[in-house]
Amino acid sequence: KCVKKHMHKDTLFVLDIFVPNPLFLYRPETRFPVMEYIDSLTGELTKVEEISVYDSDSGINKITWFYNTPSQTDDKIYNFTMRMYFPDTMKRLLIDSGFTIQKMIGKHDFTDFQEDSELQIYICKK
């Protein structure tokens, strides 16, 4: 409703979110590497690992990131949650909110959405 208040009749509302990957959501609850980078303050190589626990009933993915350096294991630990929106749910939410989905694309190059698309991009009008 808030978005629609700021729209006029010709405004396009574009929503860009990733498609949840079932292989990522249903993997074992063990640490997996996420990324590595050189810390700009210490110059140390920092490795980030994560554990994720997905609750399919709520659609919430509970994620813990562990930051490790050569000098300290679990130097920092961050916990956060992410709500997963599969395409069928996102379409229903947009339509139930009064939007008309003009086009759904799967990449920023405007390629049509496919079953294997990593993104779900909705171009909507009110």
Language-model segments: residues:
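A short hydrophobic/small-residue beta-strand
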Residues: F13-V14, I101
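A short glycine-rich, Lys/Arg-flanked "PGG" loop and its adjoining helix->strand segment in the class I
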Residues: K1-L12
